[in-house]
C-alpha cells in the first residue's frame, strides 16, 4: 500500500519517514507533503517519493494518508480528501468541531481512524481503564499526564481520551464530569486530570482508582516516540481493506 506522510517535518513525521525507509511490512512511501524544503535525504529509500507542496498532487499519489500535523493543516487536508477520498490515519490533536465534522463526511467515502495516541500500550490502557471504571464503582478516578515542555495542548489528547473512556464506563455526563482545576471538596461524579510539563518526557499517563484503604494505579510510559509512528503504520495496515467508516482504535483488538 502506498503511504503519504502529512506533517513530515514534525517529530512523529520524521519517525514515520525513518520507519518507511526500507518499506515497513510492505508499505511504500509514495508522497510527502512539505510547505518548505524537506530536510530528509530520500536517496537511501527503496522508492523515491513525490515530495511536494501541492496538496492535491500529494493526495493523488498515495492510497493512505498518515497525518501528524497541526489543526489548521488537518482542515486543509480534509478538503483535499473530500475531493479525492483516500484512507486516513490521523494523530493530530486539538481539532475544532468543524474539522471533526469534515472527518465524519470523509468517513462516508473512505475508512479513517483518528486517535490521540497510536501506541499499542495506550490502546490496552484504555481497555483496562474501562474495565476498572466499571468494576470499581466506588473508586474516585484521577488522571495524571506528563509531557515535554514544548507540548502545546493541555490536558493531552490522550488524557482526554482516557477520561472519556472512564466517564463512559461510569455513565457520567462527559461534558460536566471533567475537572482540570480543583478547588474545595471533590464532587462524587467527577474525574480529574492533572497536566505536568517538563524536560523531554515523551509521554506518561497514570489513572488512579482510589478506594477506602487502598488504591490501584494503571500507568503507561512512552520511552521512545517511535512507538507512535509504528502504531500509525499498524493502523494503516489494519484499515487497508476496511469499508468506509470512522473507526475507533480499540476496535483493532477485536
Curated annotation (Swiss-Prot):
Positions of NAD(+) binding: 7-12, 91-93, 115-118
EC number assigned by the record: 1.17.1.8
Pathway involvement of the protein, from the record: Amino-acid biosynthesis; L-lysine biosynthesis via DAP pathway; (S)-tetrahydrodipicolinate from L-aspartate: step 4/4
Organism: Helicobacter pylori (strain Shi470)
The protein, known as: 4-hydroxy-tetrahydrodipicolinate reductase
Residues reported in the UniProt entry to bind (S)-2,3,4,5-tetrahydrodipicolinate: 148, 157-158
SUPFAM superfamilies: Glyceraldehyde-3-phosphate dehydrogenase-like, C-terminal domain (SSF55347), NAD(P)-binding Rossmann-fold domains (SSF51735)
Binding residues for NADP(+): 35
Keywords recorded for this protein, A-Z: Amino-acid biosynthesis, Cytoplasm, Diaminopimelate biosynthesis, Lysine biosynthesis, NAD, NADP, Oxidoreductase
Active site as annotated: 147, 151
Entry keyword Transmembrane: no
Family: Belongs to the DapB family.
GO biological process, alphabetically ordered: diaminopimelate biosynthetic process; lysine biosynthetic process via diaminopimelate
PROSITE patterns: DAPB
One CC-aspect GO term: cytosol
Name of a matching Pfam family: DapB_C
Subcellular location: Cytoplasm
Chief site of localization: cytoplasm
Known role: Catalyzes the conversion of 4-hydroxy-tetrahydrodipicolinate (HTPA) to tetrahydrodipicolinate.
Catalytic activity from the UniProt record: (S)-2,3,4,5-tetrahydrodipicolinate + NAD(+) + H2O = (2S,4S)-4-hydroxy-2,3,4,5-tetrahydrodipicolinate + NADH + H(+); (S)-2,3,4,5-tetrahydrodipicolinate + NADP(+) + H2O = (2S,4S)-4-hydroxy-2,3,4,5-tetrahydrodipicolinate + NADPH + H(+)
Amino acid at each position: 500500500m502506498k503511504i503519504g506522510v502529512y506533517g513530515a517535518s514534525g517529530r512523529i513525521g520524521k519517525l514515520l519517514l525513518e520507519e518507511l525507509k526500507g518499506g515497513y511490512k510492505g508499505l511504500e512511501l509514495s508522497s510527502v507533503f512539505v510547505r518548505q524544503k524537506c530536510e530528509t535525504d530520500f536517496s537511501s529509500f527503496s522508492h523515491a517519493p513525490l515530495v511536494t507542496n501541492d496538496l492535491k498532487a500529494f493526495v493523488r499519489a498515495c492510497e493512505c494518508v498518515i497525518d501528524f500535523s497541526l489543526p489548521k493543516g488537518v482542515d486543509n487536508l480534509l478538503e483535499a480528501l473530500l475531493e479525492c477520498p483516500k484512507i486516513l490515519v490521523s494523530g493530530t490533536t486539538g481539532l475544532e468541531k468543524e474539522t471533526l465534522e469534515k472527518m465524519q463526511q470523509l468517513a462516508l467515502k473512505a475508512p479513517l481512524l483518528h486517535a490521540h495516541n497510536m501506541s499499542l500500550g495506550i490502546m490496552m490502557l484504555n481497555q483496562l481503564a474501562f474495565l476498572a471504571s466499571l468494576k470499581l464503582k466506588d473508586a474516585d478516578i484521577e488522571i495524571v499526564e506528563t509531557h515535554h515542555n514544548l507540548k502545546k495542548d493541555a490536558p493531552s489528547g490522550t488524557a482526554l481520551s482516557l477520561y472519556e473512556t472512564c466517564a463512559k464506563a461510569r455513565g457520567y455526563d462527559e461534558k460536566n464530569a471533567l475537572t482540570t482545576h480543583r478547588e474545595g471538596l471533590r464532587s462524587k461524579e467527577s474525574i480529574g486530570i492533572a497536566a505536568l510539563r517538563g524536560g523531554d518526557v515523551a509521554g506518561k499517563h497514570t489513572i488512579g482508582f482510589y478506594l477506602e484503604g487502598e488504591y490501584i494505579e494503571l500507568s503507561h510510559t512512552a520511552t521512545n516516540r517511535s512507538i507512535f509512528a509504528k502504531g500509525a503504520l499498524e493502523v494503516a495496515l489494519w484499515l487497508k481493506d476496511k469499508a468506509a467508516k470512522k473507526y475507533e482504535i480499540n476496535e483493532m483488538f477485536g
